[in-house]
Amino acid sequence: MICLGLEGTAEKTGVGIVTSDGEVLFNKTIMYKPPKQGINPREAADHHAETFPKLIKEAFEVVDKNEIDLIAFSQGPGLGPSLRVTATVARTLSLTLKKPIIGVNHCIAHIEIGKLTTEAEDPLTLYVSGGNTQVIAYVSKKYRVFGETLDIAVGNCLDQFARYVNLPHPGGPYIEELARKGKKLVDLPYTVKGMDIAFSGLLTAAMRAYDAGERLEDICYSLQEYAFSMLTEITERALAHTNKGEVMLVGGVAANNRLREMLKAMCEGQNVDFYVPPKEFCGDNGAMIAWLGLLMHKNGRWMSLDETKIIPNYRTDMVEVNWIKEIKGKKRKIPEHLIGKGAEADIKRDSYLDFDVIIKERVKKGYRDERLDENIRKSRTAREARYLALVKDFGIPAPYIFDVDLDNKRIMMSYINGKLAKDVIEDNLDIAYKIGEIVGKLHKNDVIHNDLTTSNFIFDKDLYIIDFGLGKISNLDEDKAVDLIVFKKAVLSTHHEKFDEIWERFLEGYKSVYDRWEIILELMKDVERRARYVE
């Protein structure tokens, strides 16, 4: 079977032809380069209308049009005008050639072409582009989003900064080139919230640094170091949460060599495999659309023309994945001398004055600039110790601190002989209620955890909260709303089958202790509506 795929979600027009055994017969793209900086959606759509006929003609010179068995197109997510042109061209081809048509999810297409062109089987995927920033993993018949941007995509961040300093579009390659000449680490915000990330503050600070007269090379270096360190960290956090044995990098920004270096170093530290597709398959392309179309069609997915309406807000986790029958992927292995290895720290069991204790050491991250890494590890070690002591004043169970060594970024704390809430919450929904109570008490006292997942609660005879490395004091309702969103998304991605029950019980516990819950939940809806893609 042979499929022709059409890609046109943003500024690239792509046509690809792929066989059912994965042979790419044709794959070519033409990028829209705006006369002025920035992409105009209408002009991008005009670009697709102009270039699709050229590419299709060229494709049919390589593969006879009568050999095509299926037409696939990017149904979303993306720019509405671009998607409409792409869908119209696909429908026209389908009707003209009298071949079936299928619309596919652009984000998932990146993952599947990555798996086709590498040895990855069941990877945790970091998808980074001008329009998307997501950490994705396959769990129970869907690709679940474990982390994503809370505002703009990383590629958009780079492009906006490039426009601000009058670099050509797309700005990423020019920033990468200038960054190689940078030496000074300019102080910029580092915004990680659980497995989520935000770039708006980073972008604004970089612009201000430019206005203040900092060398452009130093700003480009610092912008990359901060942005890519944040991306690598949330990938590592998702890796520790899912225990996948592989990481794959896809999307247009995957072409950046510094980002590749960082992720490779992180994967070596976690003893997992790292994959990146060939560069021609990293950015948007028609072959990835054709390949996903084949996977879906071969496994019984058909579409009528009425079903081919575009979906600009097409979330990755909206797609029922029927083409993955069995998972054979590797699992992350924790070294034998450790009882745990998180995204930030190695955890060893020990004894101290006849007490069972653990030593939590925030180890050096080889992927980060040494100056940035030193600051992050030291500040988070101090913060965690401070908040673990503080929350006891609110009646919240937490480990006892025996010693804090800031020079070596170590904390000695009491050992809790229990199980992670992640492993028992589905069979004991009272744990969800207790988590809600704990979070309600935190918010009542203006403490934001910033990394609420079911991996950061331990259930023994009581429920203990851990890992305040990202914690902060804030009386802002939006910070509390985002705290809940982080937890909600963690539950949705990890405990999807019991999500409704867990979330309902969590809210019952939260409401029972925090009288401002209505305000926070309403604001939570508002923040969620601002997300990049919502159903």
UniProtKB/Swiss-Prot annotation:
Q: What's noted on cofactor binding?
A: Binds 1 Fe(2+) ion per subunit.
What GO MF terms are annotated? Answer: ATP binding; iron ion binding; metalloendopeptidase activity; N(6)-L-threonylcarbamoyladenine synthase activity; protein serine kinase activity; protein serine/threonine kinase activity; protein serine/threonine/tyrosine kinase activity; zinc ion binding
Can you tell me which residues bind L-threonylcarbamoyladenylate?
Answer: Y127, V128, S129, G130, G131, D159, G172, E176, N256
InterPro entries listed in its UniProt record: ATPase_NBD, Bud32, Gcp-like_dom, KAE1/TsaD, Kae1_archaea_euk, Kinase-like_dom_sf, Peptidase_M22_CS, Prot_kinase_dom
User: Pfam families from the xrefs?
Assistant: RIO1 (PF01163), TsaD (PF00814)
- State the active site: D451
User: Which top-rank group of organisms is this from?
Assistant: Archaea
Quote the subcellular location field of this record.
Cytoplasm
Give me the reactions it catalyses: L-seryl-[protein] + ATP = O-phospho-L-seryl-[protein] + ADP + H(+); L-threonyl-[protein] + ATP = O-phospho-L-threonyl-[protein] + ADP + H(+); L-threonylcarbamoyladenylate + adenosine(37) in tRNA = N(6)-L-threonylcarbamoyladenosine(37) in tRNA + AMP + H(+)
**Where on this chain does ATP bind?**
I339, G340, K341, G342, A343, E344, A345, D346, I347, K360
Where do the segments described as Kae1 lie?
Answer: 1-323
Instruction: Kindly list the GO CC terms recorded for this protein.
Output: cytoplasm; EKC/KEOPS complex
What EC number is given for this enzyme? Answer: 2.3.1.234, 2.7.11.1
According to the record, the protein's activity is controlled as follows: Activity provided by the Kae1 region seems to be regulated via phosphorylation by the protein kinase Bud32, which is itself activated by Cgi121.
Its BP terms in the Gene Ontology are: tRNA threonylcarbamoyladenosine modification
Q: Which UniProt keywords apply?
A: Acyltransferase, ATP-binding, Cytoplasm, Iron, Kinase, Metal-binding, Multifunctional enzyme, Nucleotide-binding, Serine/threonine-protein kinase, Transferase, tRNA processing
Q: Which cofactor(s) does the record list?
A: Fe(2+)
Domain Protein kinase, residue spans: 333-535
Which residues are recorded as binding Fe cation? Answer: H106, H110, Y127, D284
Q: Which SUPFAM superfamilies match?
A: Actin-like ATPase domain, Protein kinase-like (PK-like)
What protein family is recorded?
In the N-terminal section; belongs to the KAE1 / TsaD family.
Among NCBIfam families, the record links this protein to: arch_bud32, arch_KAE1, gcp_kae1, PRK09605.1
Q: What does this protein do?
A: Required for the formation of a threonylcarbamoyl group on adenosine at position 37 (t(6)A37) in tRNAs that read codons beginning with adenine. Is a component of the KEOPS complex that is probably involved in the transfer of the threonylcarbamoyl moiety of threonylcarbamoyl-AMP (TC-AMP) to the N6 group of A37. The Kae1 domain likely plays a direct catalytic role in this reaction. The Bud32 domain probably displays kinase activity that regulates Kae1 function. In vitro, exhibits low ATPase activity, but does not bind DNA and does not have endonuclease activity.
Q: How does it assemble?
A: Component of the KEOPS complex that consists of Kae1, Bud32, Cgi121 and Pcc1; the whole complex dimerizes.
Its recorded name reads Probable bifunctional tRNA threonylcarbamoyladenosine biosynthesis protein
Species in which this protein is naturally found: Methanocaldococcus jannaschii (strain ATCC 43067 / DSM 2661 / JAL-1 / JCM 10045 / NBRC 100440)
Q: What phylogenetic lineage does the species belong to?
A: Archaea, Methanobacteriati, Methanobacteriota, Methanomada group, Methanococci
